[in-house]
Amino acid sequence: MAKGKRTFQPNNRRRSRVHGFRSRMSTRAGRAIVSARRRKGRKSLTA
């Protein structure tokens, strides 16, 4: 049985477009995520 290809193909532009700060701030739910991570004291808020 073949395992199949690796599913994680790193791409910095897609990473920041999907998970970045600007995209998080563009929706209400995303702002909630960022504020929750601030409240928790995360060193890194977004990707």
Curated annotation (Swiss-Prot):
HAMAP family tied to this protein: Ribosomal_bL34 (MF_00391)
Coiled coil: none
Organism: Corynebacterium kroppenstedtii (strain DSM 44385 / JCM 11950 / CIP 105744 / CCUG 35717)
Sequence ranges of Basic residues compositional bias: 1-22, 36-47
Gene3D superfamilies associated with the record: 1.10.287.3980
Name of this protein: Large ribosomal subunit protein bL34
GO MF, any single term: structural constituent of ribosome
Gene this protein is translated from: rpmH
Keywords attached to this entry: Ribonucleoprotein, Ribosomal protein
Location of the region described as Disordered in the Swiss-Prot/TrEMBL record: 1-47
GO biological process: translation
